[in-house]
A protein has these predicted regions:
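Transmembrane beta-strand segments that form the barrel wall of outer-membrane beta-barrel proteins
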Residues: 190-206, 228
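Cleavable N-terminal export/targeting peptides
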Residues: 1-36
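Short glycine/proline- and aromatic-enriched beta-strand/turn motifs that initiate or cap beta-hairpins
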Residues: 27-94
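Residues on the lipid-exposed face of transmembrane beta-strands in outer-membrane beta-barrel proteins
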Residues: 41-43, 77-83, 127-131, 145-147, ...
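Outer-envelope beta-barrel architecture signal
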Residues: 33-39, 75, 84-86, 137-143, ...
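Extracellular/periplasm-exposed beta-strand and loop segments of Gram-negative cell-envelope proteins
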Residues: 49-72, 92-124, 150-173, 201, ...
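Outer-membrane beta-barrel proteins
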Residues: 24, 28-32, 83-85, 128-136, ...
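Outer-membrane beta-barrel pore domains and translocons
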Residues: 44-46, 82, 93-95, 132, ...
Length: 255
């Protein structure tokens, strides 16, 4: 009779873990360093909200401010190695999230007031290899292939009517992706770019689009844009579809 409650908690945990997982493409090296390996990275604040549908048919609508309030700690970073037309990218994320809330659950079709405590520890990695196929007149096109992987542990606890529910679970998923990024320079400093990818594997389909405007400084780029990421699944255990959308602000740097 309690099956729907832990399943919904696991779905929420996956939502939180996937929110910040991302591939952050970094432009390939040019000029005199094109024959040598160079290294760079990216850091972003993505103010994304979450919308979707759970496996039970419930609507999911979580604003960015609510997700931020649940964060206990985390480590997030992206590194890229570039040589000539090739770029190797690895994005790593560790999150610890703790959410306590009074909510209404659905047990055997009846609404029940619940005191809910959810703890999540998650690891996400997005990785890939990109190759520059066009680089002419301030316009470039990179094609990418790679994957997304996540691993998470969830501890769920709920109390209602002097009874207590405890539930723990773990899981992982791996999807292959293909994608590309086009970049157009607007003079020496300004540029615009558009990144997109699509993939499948343990999920039915995952895809994203990511338009960005950037400004080049001496040792880093300042970028601003908008990102939309969506997953669809056919396993019926957690959610039917999820989308993550919101503005972003960040920097790209090299060393």
């Amino acid at each position: 009779m309690y099956y729907c409650v832990p399943r919904l908690a696991t779905g929420l945990a996956i939502v939180l873990c996937c929110l910040l997982a991302s591939s952050l493409p970094v432009k390939a090296a040019t000029g005199p360093d094109a024959d040598h390996w160079t290294f760079g990275g990216s850091a972003y604040l993505w103010a994304a909200g979450v919308e979707g549908t759970s496996a039970e048919g419930d609507d999911i609508d979580i604003p960015f401010t609510e997700l931020l309030g649940s964060l206990e700690g985390g480590l997030m970073g992206t590194l890229a190695a570039q040589k000539d037309k090739w770029t190797v990218i690895a994005d790593l994320l560790y999150l610890s999230i703790h959410e306590e809330d009074d909510t209404t659950g659905n047990l055997v079709g009846l609404p029940v007031e619940l005191d809910v405590d959810v703890k999540l520890r998650g690891f996400v990695s997005t990785f890939g290899v990109a190759y520059r196929v066009i680089d002419v007149g301030g316009t470039s096109l990179d094609l990418l292939t790679g994957g997304r992987y996540f691993d998470l542990d969830v501890d769920f606890e709920a109390e209602f009517a002097a009874q207590k529910i405890e539930y723990s679970d773990s899981g992982h998923a791996l999807d292959g992706i293909i994608g590309g990024q086009v970049l157009k320079s607007l003079g020496d400093r300004w540029y615009v770019s558009f990144y997109g990818d699509i993939g499948t594997g343990d999920s039915e389909v995952t895809w994203q689009v990511w338009p960005v405007a950037g400004y080049r400084l001496e040792n880093l780029d300042v970028v601003a844009g908008y990102r939309h990421l969506k997953w669809e699944t056919d396993d019926g255990d957690t959610f039917d579809d999820l989308s993550f959308s919101g503005p972003l602000l960040g920097v790209k740097f090299s060393f």
